[in-house]
Amino acid sequence: MSEGEGQAKNRLFLGIDLGTSHTAVMSSRGKKFLLKSVVGYPKDVIGLKLLGRPYVVGDEAFEMRSYLDIRYPLQDGVLSEISDRDIEVARHLLTHVVKSAEPGPNDEICAVIGVPARASAANKALLLKMAQEVVHTALVVSEPFMVGYGLDKLINTIIVDIGAGTTDICALKGTVPGPEDQVTLTKAGNYVDERLQNAILERHPELQMNVNVACAVKEQFSFVGTPTEVASFEFRAAGKPVRADVTEPVKIACEALMPDIIESIETLLRSFQPEYQATVLQNIVFAGGGSRIRGLAAYVKEKLRPFGDANVTCVKDPTFDGCRGALRLAEELPPQYWRQLGDVSGS
């Protein structure tokens, strides 16, 4: 066996969709998992005693949030270089993600990591610097491009990836998308949570509300257009259970996302050559957690009617379609060619 063959055999490929709210991972050995993009630290000595370790990552940290200092290292889908502390939090998350993929001691770890479509060069460089500490080779690519690659939709397609921190929109034209082919909006899932919390409190000021409750309402009832059911949810008021109809607040919050998304789709549609635009309209694909919004495809199709008859679809697996595309890219394209696609660290 040659040295090259030995290296290939010991390579572990990872597709990582690093999100503001959740991180999804798939490996070339069949490992597949989702965790909250959160790190928890004890608030005081009592918290340290309860936790029994210096920090905890993911869903476990979120469940212990009553006595932990909860940190989300990703803001609007990118790492924020505010202080050494912020960088340390991000490092703890990334280290945990790679460790959870269960690499062997002699593995060469090669990871493709998704970032928002218009992430800055500084943010990409910071992520790659951190990745270099835990993997041998890392490539950062735009999240909607990862989705398109996984779906074999790389030409005459517009991908709209609605995450928690950002909505990323990408025009795929048969080449690696450039900045002019992509849009990043900061109105996404977290924005809906905030709008929904405010809209509910405007109508029901007696309810005890926070963004976690608003998120639970959104995940159960989110819709745009005409409602198909009453959004009746059990809240708390003065500590007692109270059921309230929040159908209208849910509609208002979810539809608040739509104008910027529609405008961005229209702008990117016009960037295609005119002879391809009718074909592009047949390939509008929504991905990410926001693609679960009921009535989304029909709503967007109607808004795009002035441009022609559109075919709008939502991916079947919004949780893992991004990292699945990243893993497929990692496996199909040898790491020595990754620099042709984007920013790379390592070999």
From Swiss-Prot:
Family membership: Belongs to the FtsA/MreB family. MamK subfamily.
Mind giving the lineage of the organism this protein is from?
Answer: Bacteria, Pseudomonadati, Pseudomonadota, Alphaproteobacteria, Rhodospirillales
Stated membrane topology is:
Peripheral membrane protein
Which organism was this protein described from? Paramagnetospirillum magneticum (strain ATCC 700264 / AMB-1)
The cross-references to InterPro entries, in alphabetical order and at most eight, read: Actin, ATPase_NBD, MreB_MamK-like
Q: Which domain of life is it from?
A: Bacteria
- What protein name is recorded for this chain? Actin-like protein MamK
Task: Give the subcellular location.
Answer: Cytoplasm; Cytoplasm, Cytoskeleton; Magnetosome membrane
Subunit and partners? Forms cytoplasmic filaments. Filaments are parallel (polar) and double-helical. MamK subunits from each of the two strands are juxtaposed, each monomer binds ADP. At cell poles and septa interacts with methyl-accepting chemotaxis protein Amb0944 (MCP10). Forms filaments with MamK-like protein.
Question: Any additional notes?
Answer: This bacteria makes up to 20 cubo-octahedral magnetosomes of about 45 nm in diameter which contain membrane-bound crystals of magnetite (Fe(3)O(4)).
Which positions does UniProt annotate for ATP binding?
K9, T20, S21, D76, A164, G165, T166, K218, E219, Q220, F221, S222, G289
Q: How is its activity regulated?
A: Filament turnover is promoted by MamJ and/or LimJ which have overlapping function; at least one other protein is required for turnover. MamK filament dynamics are probably required for the assembly or maintenance of the magnetosome chain.
Q: What does this protein do?
A: Protein with ATPase activity which forms dynamic cytoplasmic filaments (probably with paralog MamK-like) that organize magnetosomes into long chains running parallel to the long axis of the cell. Turnover of MamK filaments is probably promoted by MamK-like, which provides a monomer pool. Forms twisted filaments in the presence of ATP or GTP. Serves to close gaps between magnetosomes in the chain. Interaction with MCP10 is involved in controlling the response to magnetic fields, possibly by controlling flagellar rotation.
| A single GO molecular function term of this UniProt record | metal ion binding
